[in-house]
């Protein structure tokens, strides 16, 4: 069987409602370079078949930029590293509502509230709940949250407030995780995802590629994501932050990024697969190729500690390649 025939066989499994195996995924991730376009094309056909031409466009609000207690080696907001990043406390509900309204007017269909802490204190959680209530009452945009570790009570409260989706990234493969973070475990992250799922929240999870992991470890992360089967996968591409242990990390080749997104699509045909942080910095085309290689979502107008494309530019890019953003 030729490589192209194998790719098509895997695609047919997906179209037939079956799952490809871990062995299939490994072979797909390791296909020869000359077949990479075949892999991307078939992943794109899966995306269109299961999800249509719509691209999920999201905006973030880093509502608390903090000196976080965790030592994640990629993060410019960790208190362990001297990165010179400005910190600030939770803004007023009025400030967040204004930004959420602007995001809606710019074509975002979801608005994610993100906070840099291990987990929310009781006081901070109550403030976030008030912000969510105000957005629901005054804006009417789909609210998502990324607030760190959750208790069962907090997850239930978010569900009661009509939060659609909870983000909590695995960050990397389990075998790589101890090199990336020592202040909590991989199991801690899985536990929070389970709590969110049990409360009825949709899941958004993923990680960062380009941390120095091997291709095998990217496969490991991908298979764990497939096991969780989240409604949304978010993949960041490392942008090294000066002052962090990964400040000198070399860029991941574009072909490795395409492989990752394409194989995730074979494993998760129905999920939103979102190109997140590092899109503009690492991809010369700002994601055009990936949106035709398995991805069907982007974050626009900036990230947690860095800027990004203006929404208008991203919507134009989506339309340029024949897809729809609204």
Swiss-Prot record:
Pathway(s) it belongs to: Cofactor biosynthesis; biotin biosynthesis; biotin from 7,8-diaminononanoate: step 2/2
Q: What class of enzyme is it?
A: transferase
The source's superkingdom equals: Archaea
Q: Where does [2Fe-2S] cluster bind?
A: 112, 145, 204, 274
| Keyword Zinc among record annotations | no
Would I find Iron among this entry's keywords? yes
**A Pfam entry, by short name:** BATS
Concerning Gene3D superfamilies, the annotation shows: Aldolase class I
Q: Which cofactor does it need?
A: [4Fe-4S] cluster; [2Fe-2S] cluster
Q: Which reaction does it catalyse?
A: (4R,5S)-dethiobiotin + (sulfur carrier)-SH + 2 reduced [2Fe-2S]-[ferredoxin] + 2 S-adenosyl-L-methionine = (sulfur carrier)-H + biotin + 2 5'-deoxyadenosine + 2 L-methionine + 2 oxidized [2Fe-2S]-[ferredoxin]
Give the co-factor note: Binds 1 [4Fe-4S] cluster. The cluster is coordinated with 3 cysteines and an exchangeable S-adenosyl-L-methionine. Binds 1 [2Fe-2S] cluster. The cluster is coordinated with 3 cysteines and 1 arginine.
Q: Which NCBIfam families match?
A: bioB
Summary of subunit composition and partner proteins = Homodimer.
Q: What is this protein called?
A: Biotin synthase
């Amino acid at each position: 069987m030729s490589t192209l025939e194998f790719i098509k066989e895997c695609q047919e499994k997906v179209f037939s409602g079956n799952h490809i195996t871990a062995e299939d995924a490994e072979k797909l991730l390791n296909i020869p370079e000359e077949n990479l376009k075949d892999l991307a094309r078939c992943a794109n056909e899966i995306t269109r078949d299961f999800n249509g031409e719509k691209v999920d466009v999201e905006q973030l609000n880093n509502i608390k930029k903090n000196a976080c207690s965790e030592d994640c080696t990629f993060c410019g907001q960790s208190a362990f590293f001297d990165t010179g990043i400005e910190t600030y406390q939770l803004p007023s509900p009025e400030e967040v509502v204004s930004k959420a309204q602007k995001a809606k007017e710019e074509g975002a269909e979801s608005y994610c509230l993100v906070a840099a802490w291990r987990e929310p204190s009781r006081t901070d959680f109550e403030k976030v709940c008030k912000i969510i209530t105000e957005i629901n009452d005054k804006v009417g945009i789909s609210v998502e949250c990324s607030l760190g570790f959750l208790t069962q009570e907090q997850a239930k409260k978010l569900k009661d407030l009509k939060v659609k989706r909870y983000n909590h990234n695995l960050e990397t493969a389990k075998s790589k995780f101890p090199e990336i973070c020592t202040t909590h475990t991989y199991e801690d992250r899985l536990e929070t995802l389970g709590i969110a799922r049990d409360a009825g929240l949709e899941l958004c999870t993923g990680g960062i590629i380009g941390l120095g992991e091997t291709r095998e470890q990217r496969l490991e992360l991908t298979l764990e994501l497939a096991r969780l089967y989240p409604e949304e996968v978010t993949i960041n591409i490392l942008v090294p932050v000066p002052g962090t242990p990964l400040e000198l990390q070399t860029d991941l080749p574009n072909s490795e990024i395409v492989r990752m997104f394409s194989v995730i699509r074979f494993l998760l045909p129905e999920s939103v697969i979102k190109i997140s942080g590092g899109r503009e910095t690492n991809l010369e085309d700002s994601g055009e190729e990936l949106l035709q290689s398995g991805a069907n979502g982007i974050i626009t107008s900036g990230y947690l500690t860095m800027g990004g494309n203006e929404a208008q530019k991203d919507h134009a890019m989506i339309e340029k390649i024949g897809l729809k953003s609204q």
